[in-house]
């Protein structure tokens, strides 16, 4: 398939630049992967669609304030976007400046902190913090929330809370697992009260999630790598859920990719997994674990719309997106959501 097959025209006003006042006040488009049937709902209607005994799997990564500003030794301004933390002092990062910083040169960050340019790895720079503090402490002090480019505004104080799930736990993401943004504590409690089981995996979403696919045919695309962790207790819960004939519902494409990575690493049998994954899911992929998913509306030609198309059928998904545009759903990170069931192969 060609990347251009996943293109669609989106009116600019449908890109959500701010979240709804209440997390669960979004709309929800339901898509039956088998029939292609669509339903226009409210996000809170999801409670009626998840059955007792179903297992919902969430990504509990925490978004770090990954964008920093500073100056090179020459005085030229630069912007740093963390791609991943290598340890307490070192990061891999995207650096934007008029000229790339040289190896061994110093970078002066806002707030008086200093970093040293250690090495260059293709388009990424390895930087080392020269401080008693850790990278996380410096990011919390001077970093900005790394809002995606299409939100097209500076980050605000409110984004520190709203571009973060209520159940975030493990710092390391530079983009939010956005399907999870719709859930508040009351909704999670209501799901549990109904007898729905809740589990957490971790996938530290990288800035690569926003990189455009720069090839013509999707099989040529080289997927970026991200760190994921699927613990043994989640594997056990999934086995119990499947044995009882219930569904595994992944909240977000990152949860889908975590679970399917764990199955891929052990050749189809789900086992605990911790490490880097570059799994690229596109039409033709056979899902091993996930039966249904909650997901936001994704960018045209992105690897994420390809994943949803693999799950529910290309024609069904593209038709659903056209319906969403006609019905003026809000798109992307701060936008509305879909509840999608898997197409039988």
Swiss-Prot record:
Reaction(s) the record says it catalyses: 7-aminomethyl-7-carbaguanosine(34) in tRNA + S-adenosyl-L-methionine = epoxyqueuosine(34) in tRNA + adenine + L-methionine + 2 H(+)
SUPFAM superfamilies the record matches: QueA-like
GO molecular function ontology, one term from the record: S-adenosylmethionine:tRNA ribosyltransferase-isomerase activity
Keywords: Cytoplasm, Queuosine biosynthesis, S-adenosyl-L-methionine, Transferase
Pathway participation: tRNA modification; tRNA-queuosine biosynthesis
Localization, UniProt: Cytoplasm
GO BP term, pick one: tRNA wobble guanine modification
Chief location category: cytoplasm
Broad class of enzyme this protein falls into: transferase
Listed EC numbers: 2.4.99.17
Name of the protein in question: S-adenosylmethionine:tRNA ribosyltransferase-isomerase
Organism: Shewanella sp. (strain W3-18-1)
Gene: queA
């Amino acid at each position: 398939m060609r990347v251009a097959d996943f293109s669609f025209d989106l009116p600019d006003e449908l890109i959500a630049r701010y979240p709804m006042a209440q997390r669960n006040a979004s709309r929800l488009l339901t898509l039956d992967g088998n029939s292609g049937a669509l339903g226009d709902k409210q996000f809170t209607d999801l409670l009626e669609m998840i059955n007792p005994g179903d297992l919902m799997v969430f990504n509990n990564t925490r978004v770090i304030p990954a964008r920093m500003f500073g100056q090179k030794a020459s005085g030229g301004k630069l912007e740093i976007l963390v791609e991943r933390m290598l340890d307490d002092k070192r990061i891999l990062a995207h650096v934007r400046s008029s000229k790339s910083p040289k190896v061994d040169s110093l970078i002066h960050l806002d707030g008086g902190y200093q970093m040293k340019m250690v090495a260059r790895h293709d388009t990424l720079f390895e930087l080392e913090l020269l401080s008693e503090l850790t990278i996380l402490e410096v990011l919390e002090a001077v970093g900005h929330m790394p809002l995606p480019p299409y939100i097209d505004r500076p980050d605000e104080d409110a984004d520190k809370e709203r571009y973060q799930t209520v159940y975030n736990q493990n710092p390391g993401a530079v983009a939010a697992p956005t399907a999870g943004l719709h859930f508040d504590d009351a909704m999670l409690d209501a799901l549990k009260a109904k007898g729905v089981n809740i589990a957490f995996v971790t996938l530290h979403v990288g800035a690569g999630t926003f990189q455009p696919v720069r090839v013509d045919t999707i099989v040529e695309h080289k997927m970026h790598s991200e760190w994921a962790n699927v613990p043994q207790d989640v594997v056990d819960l999934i086995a119990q859920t499947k044995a009882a004939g219930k569904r595994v519902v992944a909240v977000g494409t990152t949860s889908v990719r975590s679970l399917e990575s764990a199955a891929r690493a052990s050749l189809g049998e789900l086992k605990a997994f911790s490490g880097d994954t570059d799994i690229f899911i596109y039409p033709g992929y056979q899902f091993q674990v996930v039966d249904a998913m909650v997901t936001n509306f994704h960018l045209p030609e992105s690897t994420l719309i390809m994943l949803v198309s693999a799950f529910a059928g290309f024609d069904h998904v593209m038709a659903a997106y056209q319906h969403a545009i006609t019905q003026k759903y809000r798109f992307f990170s701060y936008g509305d959501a879909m509840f999608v069931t898997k197409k039988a192969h």
